[in-house]
Each structure stands twice: as C-alpha cells, then as structure tokens.
Amino acid sequence: MPNKGREMLKTDYVFQATEEPRELVRLQMLERIFDAGTQRRMLATGLTTGWHCLEVGAGAGSIVRWLEQRVGPSGKVVALDTNPRFLRGSSSSTIEIMQGDICDMELPLATFDLVHARYVMIHIAEYRKAFERMLRCVKPGGWVVIEEPDFQAARAVTGPEESRLSFGRVTDAIERMFTSLGMDYALGAQLPALFQEYDLSHLTVEHEGHLSAGGGMVAQLMKLSAEQLRDKYVATGKVTEADIEQYCRLADDPDAWAIYYATVAVTGWWQPQCSGPA
C-alpha cells in the first residue's frame, strides 16, 4: 500500500538527518526497552479485537505490528510518521501507513478507539496543536496513551568526577538544543496537567526515572544518541567534543550510575460531558 499524505515540516525531529542504519538501531533499542510498558498500558484500556488504533510516530514499527495482532482482521491500525522509512513491508489489510506530520494531516474525526504516541510530542514546538489533533481523532469513549521524556531529571550519581561534570554539561546541551527549537526538554512532566486541561478523565500517570549503570540498555541508548547528535550538542556551546567522549565513557562504565532521563506516561479517557466508562 503506498504512503499517503505529504511530508510536513512542523516537527523538527532532531534525528531526521542521522544515518539510516544507526537510527534503526536506536529505534530498535527503544523498542526493546519500552515496548513491554507501552503494551501493558494499551492493554489496560481494554484494547481488543476490532478496535481502530492510531500510532503517531510509528518509528521502526514494533507497536504497529503488535497492535495488528491485538485488533485482528476486523480492526484497523494507522501508522503515521514523518519519515516511514523503517515501515517498508509493514502494510497489510489491517495496517495503513501514512506519511506526514500530526499537526497538519487531515485524519478522520472521532474514528479511533485508541491513539498512542511515544517520544513524539517532545519534538514538536506546537505540541498543544499536536495533542488537539490527536483528540479530534478519538471516538467518544476512546483512549489516549502518551509517553514522553523528562530530561530535567537527568543527573550522574557515581563515577569519575570529570565524567560526572561532563554528564551535566551534556544534559545542559540537550536542554539548549530543544529550547533553541522552541521545544520543552522536560515535556513529560507537563503531560498530566495537559490531559486535565483538555478534560480527559480516569487518568493513569506513571513516572519512571531511568537509573542505569554504564553498559545498561538505557545508558547505551543515550550513548548512541550522543554520538548521533554530537554536532548538535557541540553547536549549543554548552559542551566540547571532550565532554561527549567523557559522557560516552561513563555510559560504558559498569561502576558508574546515572539517571539518564525519566519517562512520564499518561493514559486518559476521552468522553466530554459524560461521567465515565461503563
């Protein structure tokens, strides 16, 4: 099935220009670390056969393929991504791949039983507009599951002093990189209030600080990100090449512990002016 829509520019995805093989590795690492939690949250909504689901920012496609198995042939999964380069071959009678930006795509209104996005809104300066677009797609009585990072939580706990200082400077560079694009590097912390503001109810809020020793999955994920975004980090003026090297050494050191960031996940029920799910 051909991709639909047109590629938009509202989302300044910081990994857009990275080398395809390394970006696929990074996305697959995200899947290995976080898919189990994402799937648990989705199942808690009552996800079942016949549901129509929208996956915003489909990445390497693991959640899309998992949803296909859950909803079955009577259901529908729409996979939206600004660059669906890693979704080739995922189309089926159940899965529809769309290329575009959630802020501008003309998606069917009040259609989906479940809308999900993971690590998407942090890359969108107009994240409220993106959220509103998602809500417009949800059926009355449908569910929204959003998972976003909070880099404000990051800090080195143990390890050589030089590496810990460099870790702090890299975190400052991450903040500057996002804020220079009009984005919030701690967006995850804003999610619960955002869901309340838009009158979603029956909220479930989870906060997980990713404390990892060097060599752990999260540490290696952030090392790979630092290597891919090295030029962007240095361009902020907050770090040097040497700082990034020290950060990567700490991420490899099994005796060095750090909170690399936190993830906030919020699930909410969308039914304006109604008391709650049956």
What does each model-found stretch correspond to?
Residues 145-216, 231:
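Conserved catalytic/acceptor-binding region of the Class I
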